[in-house]
């Protein structure tokens, strides 16, 4: 059995320090949220930041510290009523799926979202209408995951 950890729950100020500490604590696999372990990484800019060079660096560090990325986090609101933000969110998921494959991640993780701009839990989150909206909005992400040979984990 392998025991993993959310990488941002380890001490460190950059990806390498977090990975080193995960290894020293006895973990062999990690959940990576880039914005929490890479200084200056902003999720809003992920499509531009998740480059081949960064993937090579991350994959090299994972290998150096004998870690496996089980899950690459991309917890953005797929149910936002802001359609311009939704288009950017879709680009972000696609970038995470591509990047995840390049670093050897098993899956990209997400949540079902909230039908509001603030991404806040509310009674409407638990309605049939919200579920239908999520299912419709996640379809292209699932298709891209299949194209990349990745899994999409939904919390």
What label would you give each PLM region?
Residues 16-18, 56-65, 78-155:
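Active-site acidic/histidine proton-transfer and metal-coordination neighborhood
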Residues 15-38, 103-107:
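Catalytic domains of carbohydrate-active enzymes, especially glycoside hydrolases
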Residues 7-15:
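Short polar catalytic/cofactor-binding loops
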Residues 2-7, 30-32, 69-74, 108-110, ...:
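Hydrophobic faces of well-ordered beta-strands that scaffold small-molecule active sites
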Residues 31-57, 112-120:
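Glycine-rich, proline-tolerant flexible connector loops at the mouths of alpha/beta enzymes
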Residues 39-45, 73-81:
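Glycine-/proline-rich flexible loop or hinge segments
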Residues 9-10, 50, 88, 133:
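Residues that cap or flank secondary-structure elements
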Residues 1-3, 62-63:
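N-terminal amphipathic alpha-helix/helix-capping segment at the start of soluble metabolic enzymes
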